[in-house]
């Protein structure tokens, strides 16, 4: 077994988990403090982003930042790299922490806010919102870590050597089942450990509670924090949903190959 590839996969999954829980938490805060059309659009973007196939997301960024990408002359970022895989996986997986953090935020009540009427903005986040959502953040981070570690499609397309992709290539070319038992334990160990850690733990889902009214939460967050979460949501919905769908709909091959 290649320990170097195994550690490379672990080093890939960690930044993906950290990035997705950060973006997902900010997006959850935006949804919890929004109402009407803005809330529905954000939720729709979260769900669509989670449902998009990996090859569609990767193809968009290959067209933009690949060897002959449109933006390559102006943005010399190597998409065929460790950082490129982290970026694409972050765009694919941030909805999971968003939905789980939103469920935790939905448990916020007016009584909790009234207990500390002077808490607003960042002090409110630090003293109340982060502690009450921390279990959901940790749970979602572990799930994303396992998904990123075992992802095969994105690293394989971007030609980044990681343990699952290398294992799949070797097995698919030789159909060596002894190799499966010898190396496959590393891929199975992480999800099994995750199931063990999360056994018996309750997940807070967004539809289980109504939560505090959006107007009340918005007033307590303050304009600066609202602007930050709004920019984060708009940016990631645009990059992870509108960009892939726009590429799919505007590409003439999408219609000629039907």
Question: How would you describe each model-predicted region?
Answer:
Residues 1-106, 132-156, 180-199, 223-253, ...:
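Membrane-water interface segments at the C-terminal ends of transmembrane alpha-helices
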Residues 43, 66, 110-118, 127, ...:
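Short amphipathic alpha-helical coupling elements at transmembrane boundaries
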Residues 63-74, 158-164, 205-213:
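Peri-membrane helix termini and adjoining interfacial loops of integral membrane proteins
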Residues 106-133, 160:
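Short helix-to-coil transition segments within interhelical loops
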Residues 116, 179-180:
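Solenoid-repeat scaffolds in large eukaryotic assemblies
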Residues 149-175:
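Glycine-rich helix-loop "coupling/hinge" segments at transmembrane-helix boundaries
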Residues 201-232:
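Flexible interhelical linker loops that connect adjacent transmembrane helices
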């Amino acid at each position: 077994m290649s320990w170097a590839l195994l550690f490379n996969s672990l080093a890939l999954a960690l930044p993906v988990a950290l990035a997705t829980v950060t973006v997902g938490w900010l997006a959850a805060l935006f949804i919890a403090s929004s109402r009407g059309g803005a809330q529905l659009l954000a939720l729709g973007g979260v769900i669509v982003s989670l449902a998009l196939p990996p090859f569609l997301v990767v193809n968009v960024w290959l067209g933009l930042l690949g060897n002959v990408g449109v933006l390559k002359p102006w943005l010399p970022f190597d998409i065929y790299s460790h950082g490129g895989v982290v970026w694409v996986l972050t765009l694919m997986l941030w909805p999971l922490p968003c939905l789980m953090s939103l469920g935790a935020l939905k448990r916020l009540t007016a009584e909790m806010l009234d207990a500390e009427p002077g808490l607003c903005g960042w002090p409110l986040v630090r003293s109340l919102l982060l502690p009450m959502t921390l279990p959901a953040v940790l749970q979602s981070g572990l799930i994303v870590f396992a998904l990123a570690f075992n992802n095969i499609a994105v690293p394989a397309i971007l030609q980044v050597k990681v343990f699952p992709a290398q294992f799949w290539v070797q097995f698919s070319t030789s159909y060596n089942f002894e190799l499966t038992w010898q190396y496959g334990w590393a891929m199975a160990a992480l999800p099994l450990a995750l199931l063990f850690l999360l056994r018996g733990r309750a997940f807070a889902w967004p539809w289980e509670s109504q939560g505090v009214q959006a107007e009340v939460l918005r007033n307590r967050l303050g304009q600066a924090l609202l602007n930050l979460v709004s920019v984060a949501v708009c940016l990631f919905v645009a990059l992870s949903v509108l960009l892939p769908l726009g590429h799919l709909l505007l590409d003439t091959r999408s219609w000629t190959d039907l």
